[in-house]
Amino acid sequence: MSRKLITINQVKDYVGQEVTIGAWVANKSGKGKLAFLQLRDGTAFFQAVAFKPNFIEKFGEEAGTEKFDVAKRLSQETSVYVTGIVKEDERSKFGYELDVTDLEVIGESQDYPITPKEHGTDFLMDNRHLWLRSRKQVAIQQIRNAIIYATYEFFEKNGFIKFDSPILSGNAAEDSTELFETDYFGQLAYLSQSGQLYLEAGAMALGRVFDFGPVFRAEKSKTRRHLTEFWMMDAEYSFLSHEESLDLQEAYVKALIQGVIDRAPQALETLERDVDALKRYIAEPFKRVAYDDAITLLQEHEADKDTDYEHIEHGDDFGSPHETWISNYFGVPTFVVNYPASFKAFYMKPVPGNPERVLCADLLAPEGYGEIIGGSMREDNYDALVAKMDELGMDKSEYEFYLDLRKYGSVPHGGFGIGIERMVTFVAGTKHIREAIPFPRMLHRLHP
């Protein structure tokens, strides 16, 4: 079969022309002289129509009938080369369809386990390698790709250099109780929770750096917002103030949303995402509220009939219901700033004049998606950082390189991190984070 091989998302450039598409059969229907093939190739889904008389006219009665019978017998996920004439189709959401002129089976698929009927979550997760082929799962991964692309584009435009932090580390970045341990030639090593400590070294060398890679948290959590392995973007920068950092974070999140709208509009449509809401999050300024003011707001509204969060006191950390209420109250992504030092990381710089609060921020996404970014200014004074580590009983010998950064030309600096899967979940409008990564690793889920 001689062919002009294209992908489905290219068909708009070939209206009226004969092309060939390599694809899988997602579904099929029809009767009599017609067969409707729902095709997918990773770029999009669309319909190809096989009409028996056209096959007979081209190949003769016997060969044409045999070709058409092959089309009618195609099973779900059979791979094919389909040749045909591209036509515009206003009835289709995709806008085009293919009038089939030839067909070649590449690989047959028998008894495909994920049929169009409903399946339970455990079954779908056990067959994740196949579930990824479904229309909605493809859309989610396309959104993930758009977010990753927009990440690199944003940091390139803003003068950041990609800086690769190690996955194996001899110390903890944050909470030592959530570390995966491994033997490193007789030494105890940990899988990285965050590249932040190493990025601070990068910022002292290169000014503005970012990292993007997998991180690991040994959290025994089964919520819809937690994974044990996920992909984190961490950024670190020298000479920026706290307010400038918040401006940068806001611009970054808006760039990610715009990137998805620009690069994956069909995916958003497939997922029935409210694009007008996403556009509003871009257009309107993000809200900024101090932690103590947020606590006061929660206390003032806890008796409202539509609230479902527990009472909270100043000094307490937020639970998911508190975060949901705060972001929904303001209606846009909301920065909560200046949390208590008591439950934040040791390296965060105190608020000037208020050592019980630190210069940090969590960005809470609306619609119940909760925290998507965490960031802070870092303590840049050597003596102050040593005193904090002593107060917490930390072994400073494990952080010699980190302390050195404060001894040799320390400067004001800060950074932030975003879990890409949380951002994907928010932009895609999905309910569970497990669908935001190709092969999720969660409590009790290590396969496939």
Curated annotation (Swiss-Prot):
GO terms for biological process: asparaginyl-tRNA aminoacylation. It catalyses: tRNA(Asn) + L-asparagine + ATP = L-asparaginyl-tRNA(Asn) + AMP + diphosphate + H(+). One of its GO terms (molecular function) is transferase activity. Its EC number is 6.1.1.22. Keywords: Aminoacyl-tRNA synthetase, ATP-binding, Cytoplasm, Ligase, Nucleotide-binding, Protein biosynthesis. GO terms for cellular component: cytoplasm. Gene3D superfamilies: Bira Bifunctional Protein, Domain 2 (3.30.930.10), Nucleic acid-binding proteins (2.40.50.140). It holds the Pfam family tRNA-synt_2. SUPFAM superfamilies: Class II aaRS and biotin synthetases, Nucleic acid-binding proteins. The keyword Ligase applies. Its main location: cytoplasm. The keyword Protein biosynthesis applies. It comes from the Bacteria. Homodimer. This is Asparagine--tRNA ligase. The lineage of its organism: Bacteria, Bacillati, Bacillota, Bacilli, Lactobacillales.
